[in-house]
Amino acid sequence: MKNINPTQTSAWQALQKHYDEMKDVTIAELFANDSDRFAKFSATFDDLMLVDFSKNRITEETLAKLQDLAKETDLAGAIKSMFSGEKINRTEDRAVLHVALRNRSNTPIIVDGKDVMPEVNAVLEKMKTFSQAIISGQWKGYTGKAITDVVNIGIGGSDLGPFMVTEALRPYKNHLNMHFVSNVDGTHIAEVLKKVNPETTLFLVASKTFTTQETMTNAHSARDWFLKTAGDEKHVAKHFAALSTNVKAVGEFGIDTANMFEFWDWVGGRYSLWSAIGLSIILSVGFDNFVELLSGAHAMDKHFSTTPTEKNLPILLALIGIWYNNFFGAETEAILPYDQYMHRFAAYLQQGNMESNGKYVDRNGNAVDYQTGPIIWGEPGTNGQHAFYQLIHQGTKMVPCDFIAPAITHNPLSDHHQKLLSNFFAQTEALAFGKSREVVEQEYRDQGKDPAQLEHVVPFKVFEGNRPTNSILLREITPFSLGALIALYEHKIFTQGVILNIFTFDQWGVELGKQLANRILPELGDDKAISSHDSSTNGLINRYKAWRA
């Protein structure tokens, strides 16, 4: 990968000039001037996903200039580097190969002179055998009963991805009850343990190193709870499995290392749902559906790695995002899935994007003087319409939005889905075109009211419009289409990181807080007043000690 400061490219300079020409152009004008705008600014993936980016403040010239930026920053070379197993995570000297985990074509992918695919396939086969034993009831707990509940204990990528996918694919789930515990707050594990029976519960401990503070604290509490009933430590092996690489620590915990599922240092946490970390997904929806999830992602991987830039969906979405973030000064992006099963999708992408591209140092080690990753947030529609859409429609901040919806619902109840989709279509239209003062006044006339007498209200009912959106319409949310959708966003994030000259696959920003927490923890063990920190931290700790006494 080349380290190129994007602001020093001729494409960036051209985009700055172009922004001056575009900043006052409205989406309404762009549609009025081009009856084919939708056809030109939308694309379909595999007849499963329609991506409409026509309601953006862009022209063909905008996209051409953004594509020039991708060329000048050698995006094509970076894509080749990632897919070929080059160690593009240079701060940790690691390859970045979540694409290998879903490489259904099974073509060799070489890291350090070795094809990783045989090991990937071996772990998949092991997961298949294990999951079939659990799901079929062949696997018995210590009292001879089949497993009914699975508790996944992990945090970050070991929780957000599997939790999001198992929720999104609930229509495909089997009889097993899935639970996810992440927070070190004892309330999280305590509330889950109230719902399960030690005789019929399987715990998955998801920690690559088997040292993650939150995960191991919860795992030990789960083990203690289990042994209060089971008694004999040898029973732990029937009720705990590990998603880890630390054979010694897993064995010491009491887990049979035959039930330890490995993954590799070239799998980043927030890209790990495709790996052994996805075992909870398999236990929820079955191995065949997990393979479909992998296959959908692999199809998007092929699209991303082989499709020209001008038709490449992850690249186009990434470029449009850079346009708003760096030229219009937009600080956030809203992810708005119109599907209740997708209620964890925004939280998943929040980590995927913000932990990847929330960096202020470029790949040369210098502080950047441009914007990097945006703030990602969102909630399912239509809930968000009754919460924060007010600001998106009439606030002073530009919030580019991605609207996501399936054409076919898994729950065709009455006319619920038509009502949901009518809102999905209406919101992007309203955000793009708004409502003028003239229309507001005419509405009053149509109601037999005199606008002059309502002058004090009229300004508040005007919508400026010109708020940009992308619409992603899926035929249906299936394991395959969900896999493709997740991979679409993964590659969008990667593309932005390449162009912005930052390292997308490390996360040093999570370390400092952990270090300080480890230093503070022993200080909380007694009632002595603390004076070793700044006055604020000392004051907070000392008040905590006083109140807990």
Swiss-Prot record:
- InterPro entries in alphabetical order: G6P_Isomerase, G6P_Isomerase_C, Phosphoglucose_isomerase_CS, SIS_dom_sf, SIS_PGI_1, SIS_PGI_2
Gene3D superfamilies of this UniProt entry? 1.10.1390.10, Glucose-6-phosphate isomerase like protein, domain 1
**Domain of life of the source:** Bacteria
- Give the record's keywords alphabetically: Cytoplasm, Gluconeogenesis, Glycolysis, Isomerase
Q: Name one GO molecular function term.
A: carbohydrate derivative binding
Gene Ontology CC annotations of this record: cytosol
Q: What's the EC number here?
A: 5.3.1.9
Catalytic residues?
A: 355, 386, 514
Entry's Gene Ontology BP terms: gluconeogenesis; glucose 6-phosphate metabolic process; glycolytic process
Question: Mind giving the lineage of the organism this protein is from?
Answer: Bacteria, Pseudomonadati, Pseudomonadota, Gammaproteobacteria, Enterobacterales
The pathway entry for this protein reads as: Carbohydrate biosynthesis; gluconeogenesis; Carbohydrate degradation; glycolysis; D-glyceraldehyde 3-phosphate and glycerone phosphate from D-glucose: step 2/4
CDD domains linked to this entry = SIS_PGI_1 (cd05015), SIS_PGI_2 (cd05016)
Keyword Nucleotide-binding: yes or no?
Answer: no
Protein's name according to its UniProt entry: Glucose-6-phosphate isomerase
- Localized where? Cytoplasm
Name the family. Belongs to the GPI family.
Q: Which PROSITE patterns match?
A: P_GLUCOSE_ISOMERASE_1, P_GLUCOSE_ISOMERASE_2, P_GLUCOSE_ISOMERASE_3
What does it catalyze?
alpha-D-glucose 6-phosphate = beta-D-fructose 6-phosphate
